[in-house]
Amino acid sequence: MAGTARGCGTSLDLLRSLPRVSLANLKPSPNSRKRERRPRDRRRGRKCGRGHKGERQRGTRPRLGFEGGQTPFYIRIPKYGFNEGHSFRHQYQPLSLRRLQYLIDLGRVDPTQPIDLTQLVNGRGVTIQPLKRDYGVQLVEEGADTFQAKINIEVQLASELAIAAIEKNGGVVTTAFYDPRSLEILCKPIPFFLRGQPIPKRMLPPESLVPYYTDAKNRGYLADPAKFPEARLELAMKFGYVLPDITKDELFRMLSARKDPRQIFFGLAPGWVVNMADKKILKPTDENLLKYYSS
């Protein structure tokens, strides 16, 4: 009897020294948990999420688009070429006259200098991505009533009303084509100059765009310059405004500046190397190089 009392006292002393029993230190009895089955798909288990028997579990469901034997929808309806050649289409980022006037008012675009993609991209006016089939900027007529700047701008496409709004203020518009390599160099000139490579020739437009850029009505850079005065006068008569005489303007030299069809930058000819470290321009002297870059 005394031994039993001594054993109970020892057990109670042991319980007093042990940590208190709580939900945090409870453990299940050994072998009381049933082990979860994990065949193949560990997330689904057992039937792998396919359910019991039938067509869905055995994997014999019909293919996508099968309509039980009748002629499916995608064969009944004829095909139309709405998206034919979509991977080869050129994309042009829109630039409205309202946005252009906003950039000029903020001083992000200088109207006293010829404006091309270099100024527009550096002024954060547009974002051009040649790798995503962007081929430049399309000038749209939004904000034509409030546009007041006198500029010499070069874009890739321009609407008729946008051209009229600029020429009404005594400005000049030129539409020009740039191949992807020339476009990337024009948008990011500093990284190209740091590589120390000669400025390449600008490629001519593809056959499908030749009619557009050789038409004076579109102010194409390949059009006959002698036809421009007639086209400008015709557009002024159509929209009913007096065409200013830019030859008497004090900014005539800036307004008459145009690039050569093979030229990428204003004032820099193909074949020249811009040395950013020494701040010098290196020009080729070899006859073969001069003949190549001038052709």
UniProtKB/Swiss-Prot annotation:
Signal peptide: none
Subcellular location(s) of the protein: Mitochondrion
Annotated transit peptide: 1-20
Ranges where the record places region Disordered: 21-67
GO biological process, one term: cellular response to leukemia inhibitory factor
InterPro entries associated with the record: Ribosomal_uL15, Ribosomal_uL15/eL18, Ribosomal_uL15/eL18_sf, Ribosomal_uL15_bac-type
Keywords per UniProt: Mitochondrion, Ribonucleoprotein, Ribosomal protein, Transit peptide
Comp. bias (Basic residues): 32-51
An example molecular function term from Gene Ontology annotations: structural constituent of ribosome
Family note: Belongs to the universal ribosomal protein uL15 family.
PANTHER family: 50S RIBOSOMAL PROTEIN L15, LARGE RIBOSOMAL SUBUNIT PROTEIN UL15M
Subunit annotation: Component of the mitochondrial ribosome large subunit (39S) which comprises a 16S rRNA and about 50 distinct proteins.
HAMAP family linked: Ribosomal_uL15
Name by which UniProt lists this protein: Large ribosomal subunit protein uL15m
